[in-house]
């Protein structure tokens, strides 16, 4: 599991794209020229940006070679760069930085967010959506299984929180719109939950394990999911998935 798997990620493309659609709907810009899609993945969010601003110069950034290859194939009219978000520098100031479900993987948000604001034009917008599920059973159980099986903690850090992000971005000279939504995804089985998180949150826990170690981890994880996520009357499972949204417009 040395690289991200675009096919696995796109297995739940409708569910993953919905927050991007809702984030984009709140971006208060009509005409833009320069746009960056940070953590663009296979290009599903980039496609939304291109659809809204077909004449804009849109650059997708991702550290995964497989994701970049998939995005380039799907969107030949956009530019894609394989790079670390923290180190990438645009050639010109940006009108919009769009980051859908990517910045949660990066540390030091108290430094990262002001840095991103500094890349914007005056009145430019930083639009961010991040999964806020560190305390959800899906992610708590990952840590518990790792502890049981004597593996080091490989999960991402919890988000800084609504009040912290508001202060960070206000102090960086932005007007801030921030909100949190919990989606309830209908899952046909506990295995479907595993399929979902294997493409994202579970990936760091599995990537350095042998095949047999992965199987032991997933078997135990499946058992614990069954305890935490009961079936509905129709046999479906409701997977709660909170997400944090931020639209920050530069005013200084």
Swiss-Prot record:
Compartments where found: Cytoplasm
Domain of life: Bacteria
Enzyme Commission number: 2.1.1.144
GO biological process: methylation
One annotated GO molecular function: trans-aconitate 2-methyltransferase activity
Keyword rRNA-binding: no
SUPFAM superfamilies, A to Z: S-adenosyl-L-methionine-dependent methyltransferases (SSF53335)
The entry's keywords: Cytoplasm, Methyltransferase, S-adenosyl-L-methionine, Transferase
Gene3D superfamilies assigned to the protein according to its UniProt record, in alphabetical order: S-adenosyl-L-methionine-dependent methyltransferases, Vaccinia Virus protein VP39
GO CC term, one of those recorded: cytoplasm
Catalytic activity: trans-aconitate + S-adenosyl-L-methionine = (E)-3-(methoxycarbonyl)pent-2-enedioate + S-adenosyl-L-homocysteine
Any Pfam family the entry gives: Methyltransf_25
Family label: Belongs to the methyltransferase superfamily. Tam family.
PANTHER family linked: TRANS-ACONITATE 2-METHYLTRANSFERASE, TRANS-ACONITATE 2-METHYLTRANSFERASE-RELATED
Role of this protein: Catalyzes the S-adenosylmethionine monomethyl esterification of trans-aconitate.
Protein name (Swiss-Prot/TrEMBL): Trans-aconitate 2-methyltransferase
Organism: Shigella flexneri serotype 5b (strain 8401)
């Amino acid at each position: 599991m040395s690289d991200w798997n675009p096919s696995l990620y796109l297995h739940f493309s409708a569910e993953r794209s919905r927050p991007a659609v809702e984030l984009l709907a709140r971006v208060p810009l009509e005409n833009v020229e320069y746009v960056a899609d940070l953590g663009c993945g296979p290009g599903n969010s980039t496609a939304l940006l291109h659809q809204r601003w077909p004449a804009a110069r849109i650059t997708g950034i991702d550290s995964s070679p497989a994701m970049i290859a998939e995005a380039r194939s799907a969107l030949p009219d956009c530019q894609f760069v394989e790079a670390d978000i923290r180190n990438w520098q645009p050639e010109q100031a940006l009108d919009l930085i769009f980051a859908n479900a990517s910045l949660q993987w990066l540390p030091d948000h108290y430094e990262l967010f002001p840095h991103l604001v500094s890349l914007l034009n005056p009145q430019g917008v930083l639009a961010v959506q991040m999964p806020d599920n560190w305390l959800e059973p899906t992610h708590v159980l990952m840590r518990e299984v790792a502890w049981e099986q004597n593996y080091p903690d490989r999960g991402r850090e919890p988000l800084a929180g609504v009040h912290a992000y508001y202060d960070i971005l206000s102090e960086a000279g932005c007007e801030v719109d921030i909100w949190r939504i919990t989606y309830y995804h209908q899952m046909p089985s506990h295995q479907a939950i595993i399929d979902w998180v294997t493409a994202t949150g579970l990936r760091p826990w599995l990537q350095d394990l042998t095949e047999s170690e992965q199987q032991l981890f997933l078997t135990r994880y499946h058992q614990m999911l069954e305890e935490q996520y009961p079936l509905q009357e129709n046999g479906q499972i409701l997977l709660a998935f909170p997400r944090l949204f931020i639209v920050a417009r530069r005013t200084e």
